[in-house]
From Swiss-Prot:
This is Cytochrome c oxidase assembly protein COX19. GO terms for cellular component: mitochondrial intermembrane space. One of its GO terms (biological process) is mitochondrial cytochrome c oxidase assembly. Belongs to the COX19 family. Residues 28-71 form the CHCH domain. The gene is COX19. It comes from the Eukaryota. Disulfide bonds join C31-C63, C41-C53.
Amino acid sequence: MATGAPGGNFRTWTPTPPERGSFPLDHDGECKEYMTKYLTCMKFTENKNAPNCRILAKQYLKCRMDNQLMEKSDWDSLGLVNLPGENDVELDHHHHLNNNNTKADGKSGSSNSNQNLANTTNNNTGTSSGTK
């Protein structure tokens, strides 16, 4: 691509690719659930880098890597290693969030996922659950 410059000088401009390659859009919505939960967490914590949001970010990136929507990368290079509370929430083979905090009867400890998000966020950021 050529660009015009004053005086009739033409220079060729060559675009440079992103450092980690291209990131295809998720047209089929394969990772939309993770993206939505991560963005909700970020909104709730006022865009602070809370540990529970980092866990959701890791799950979102794992989904993107598993579905070839981004290149596979090690967690250390992404800064997502040994996150606190990471073992409480895992990713199953069908890319759905599983909460390992279940009762003996197989039911979850809480029926409201937003309340779980709020409690986790408040525990990790030191705020009280009645504020906001």
